[in-house]
């Protein structure tokens, strides 16, 4: 992989998610240069100018401009957000037929520029699209990843915070598998204040007798659909997730994030992208952290892998 000054990010797709992700990157001053690409050049230009107009009030100036695929050549990260708003209560896999053509065209154009950075896939179904982008791009496995279950994990922590009244940042643990209906909460990994969550509830029955892990997991799974039904789409949560992943990679933070990455023997799976805890570094998905899951959790992970793999068949 080419060694670069970690300072340039390209976002392809300036809809709600792409534009909000750009706003997060700019407000946090994550890079020196941010380039926006869209099928509508006017839309990309408008978003870039709107973002740049607030530069006086940012902690760090980020140069924002509209561009084209040639700008990907020396980019450190390309974020792909192309797609359309899903209807309420829809399965993310239902977007596959529409999205795959868009993603294929984007990946081809990105690679034609000479790009050798990290692709961060956001487009749904994200696990399938990350696998497709990896296969189509020819990049090493570390350099293609999806947002995976990072947002779902954040939702889990938020909901546990709502149920207990405690700061969600006290919660540890992961949602794993597909970013979709077959995702699962790996309860064996969940802790609150360093104490296993099941034990925390048992030790505080007088306060949290009404807290149900089954209900928490279902709320986590359906949270996205509820937001879509209420406001027509999701953008803030996923955009914050994207900004966090971008920061972790650009700044080589070595954070462990449940992104969608290629399993090649880990958890007994091969040739499939799933949301699993992964150490993120400047080179992308540096190393998968293989957790000691329960037998039930492993079965759920394998089930999720089967579903994702089925939808990958025939795409190439």
From Swiss-Prot:
Protein name, per record: L-lactate dehydrogenase 1
Gene assigned in the entry? ldh1
Q: Which family does it belong to?
A: Belongs to the LDH/MDH superfamily. LDH family.
Recorded hits in InterPro entries, A to Z, give: L-lactate/malate_DH (IPR001557), L-lactate_DH (IPR011304), L-lactate_DH_AS (IPR018177), Lactate/malate_DH_C (IPR022383), Lactate/malate_DH_N (IPR001236), Lactate_DH/Glyco_Ohase_4_C (IPR015955), NAD(P)-bd_dom_sf (IPR036291)
User: Which major enzyme category is it?
Assistant: oxidoreductase
EC? 1.1.1.27
The entry marks the following residues as binding substrate, namely 92, 124-127, 152-155, 234
Listed under catalytic activity are:
(S)-lactate + NAD(+) = pyruvate + NADH + H(+)
Keywords carried by this UniProt record: Cytoplasm, NAD, Oxidoreductase
Q: Does the keyword Isomerase apply?
A: no
Record's keyword annotation contains Cytoplasm? yes
Catalytic site residues? 179
The record's subunit annotation is: Homotetramer.
Record's function text: Catalyzes the conversion of lactate to pyruvate.
- Its annotated pathway? Fermentation; pyruvate fermentation to lactate; (S)-lactate from pyruvate: step 1/1
Gene Ontology BP annotations: glycolytic process; lactate metabolic process
UniProt: NAD(+) binding residues: 17, 38, 43, 69, 122-124, 147
GO terms for CC?
cytoplasm
Molecular function GO labels: L-lactate dehydrogenase activity
């Amino acid at each position: 992989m080419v060694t670069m000054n970690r300072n340039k990010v390209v976002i392809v797709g300036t809809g709600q998610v792409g534009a909000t992700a750009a706003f997060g990157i700019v407000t946090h001053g994550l890079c020196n240069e941010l380039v926006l690409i869209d099928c509508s050049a006017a839309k990309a230009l408008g978003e870039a100018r709107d973002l740049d107009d607030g530069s006086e009030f940012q902690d760090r100036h980020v140069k924002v401009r509209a561009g084209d695929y040639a700008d990907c050549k020396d980019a450190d990260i390309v974020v792909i957000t192309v797609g359309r708003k899903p209807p309420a209560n829809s399965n993310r896999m239902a977007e596959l037929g529409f999205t795959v053509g868009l993603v294929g065209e984007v990946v081809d154009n990105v690679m034609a520029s000479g790009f050798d950075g990290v692709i961060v896939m956001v487009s749904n179904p994200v696990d399938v699209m990350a696998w497709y982008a990896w296969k189509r791009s020819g990049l090493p496995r570390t350099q293609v990843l999806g947002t995976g279950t990072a947002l779902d994990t954040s939702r889990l922590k938020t909901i546990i915070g709502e149920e207990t009244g405690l700061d969600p940042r006290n919660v540890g643990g992961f949602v794993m598998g597909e970013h979709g209906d077959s995702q699962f909460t790996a309860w064996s990994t969940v802790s609150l204040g360093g104490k296993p969550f099941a034990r925390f509830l048992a030790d505080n029955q007088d306060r949290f007798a009404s807290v149900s892990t089954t209900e928490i997991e279902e709320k986590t799974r359906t949270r996205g659909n509820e937001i879509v039904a209420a406001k027509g789409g999701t953008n803030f949560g996923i955009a914050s997730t994207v900004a966090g992943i971008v920061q972790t990679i650009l700044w080589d933070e070595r954070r462990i994030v449940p992104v969608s990455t290629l399993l090649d023997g880990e958890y007994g799976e091969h040739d499939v992208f799933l949301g699993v805890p992964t150490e993120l570094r400047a080179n992308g998905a540096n190393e998968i952290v293989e957790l000691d899951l329960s037998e039930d959790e492993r079965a759920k992970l394998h089930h999720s892998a089967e579903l994702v793999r089925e939808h990958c068949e025939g795409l190439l």
